Amino acid sequence: YEITPYEPGDCRPVVFFDLAVGDQALGRIEITLHDDVCPKTCENFRCLCTGERGNFVEGSRRTPLWYKGSRFHRVIPDFMAQGGDLEKHNGSGKGVCIYGRSFADEEASLAFDSPGVVAMAATKGQDANGCQFFVSLGEAPWLDGKHVAFGRVSSGLEVLRAIEERGSAHGRTRGVVVVQNCGQLQ
């Protein structure tokens, strides 16, 4: 695989999360998606931010394909903040995406060279991407090539730090960090 550097100012999609703990607003995180590098992964994430694809239907069960109302269920300081479980909201969901239950890995070409790198959390192993993702809270070069890294926090690193402060070494959070609203800016 090839690791490509971040190029500020590129015309890439930008999505956002407005985050809160209880009734306390934490602020907004904006994420620039590298759709030129990982188009399928970025389209899945973008659609899950906008909610434009409706519901995932399996039998009588309907799961909204939207991050609004989802949680950051696992936060480990100096490492990562994980969220996006649309089924169970605690990391144990089977996984859903705009393509069905899961989709294959794309070239993991963004480097985990700073805080704010956004990647898929393929909890079931390789080629098992769904809705769960994580945001790096520091450099993590050992993850290069192991997770599909497709975006970077372009605004709101202070909000990311506020989430990090609610984490623990085991990943449990103090308070429930919720995506109050999300969508696409550009």
Predicted segments — roles?
Residues Y1-Q186:
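Cyclophilin-like peptidyl-prolyl cis-trans isomerases
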